[in-house]
Amino acid sequence: MTEAQRHQILLEMLAQLGFVTVEKVVERLGISPATARRDINKLDESGKLKKVRNGAEAITQQRPRWTPMNLHQAQNHDEKVRIAKAASQLVNPGESVVINCGSTAFLLGREMCGKPVQIITNYLPLANYLIDQEHDSVIIMGGQYNKSQSITLSPQGSENSLYAGHWMFTSGKGLTAEGLYKTDMLTAMAEQKMLSVVGKLVVLVDSSKIGERAGMLFSRADQIDMLITGKNANPEILQQLEAQGVSIMRV
């Protein structure tokens, strides 16, 4: 029996029982305890089950991670589409834009694809899409591949400063009167290096993120040139941001 076959049977057991012990896996598959634990570890790392003491349990109500293939399933998809369309209208022919990772970033890249603009990105799903669609000018920022975010990250003191664009579009997990928050520290630090060399910083977040504070402060409010968000965004937070010079667009 191959590893793939063992994994399939193990997942079927979990679908039926909800929980299995290492002993039960050994008995059902006819393998050693060490092999059973190794299989459980691999499936846990891939997010297909949850490893627990002496066994594994099924993952319930798991929301699928979006990809360019299931982009329509992204949270607040319709609002993000409107945000991306509005953002794309800001860019003039011949300008360059920096686009980072996430569902809104991909939607923005899709809107700009085919237009006479240079797109700079470290987000591989977007880069692959642009290349596949034969977009004329794509710059892929180099670095080490980060699997969890599907991006490349350059080491400390790298040449990210060379990638200066007229516009930088980015998102985050929350936006308050203090500024934009991101939860992935490595991604945030890599992007922060570019803030001093881009022309304008535009934050793209759906209305559910307004007023939320999560992770590290990526950029202060006074560093943000424009915010594009949904019509249901907290008006009090928007007023506080406007008072600090942030231009607000609600779509």
Swiss-Prot record:
> What is the recorded function of this protein according to its Swiss-Prot or TrEMBL entry?
Represses ulaG and the ulaABCDEF operon.
Keyword Repressor appears in the UniProt entry: yes
**Coiled-coil zones:** none
Name by which UniProt lists this protein: HTH-type transcriptional regulator UlaR
Arranged from A to Z, the UniProt key words for this protein are: Cytoplasm, DNA-binding, Repressor, Transcription, Transcription regulation
Q: GO BP, one example?
A: negative regulation of DNA-templated transcription
Annotated region of DNA binding: 20-39
Q: Which GO terms describe its cellular component?
A: cytoplasm
NCBIfam families according to UniProt: PRK13509.1
Tell me which Pfam families the record gives.
DeoRC, HTH_DeoR
Enumerate the spans annotated as HTH deoR-type domain: 3-58
Q: What is its main location?
A: cytoplasm
User: Which HAMAP family is this protein grouped with?
Assistant: HTH_type_UlaR
**Has keyword Transcription?**
yes
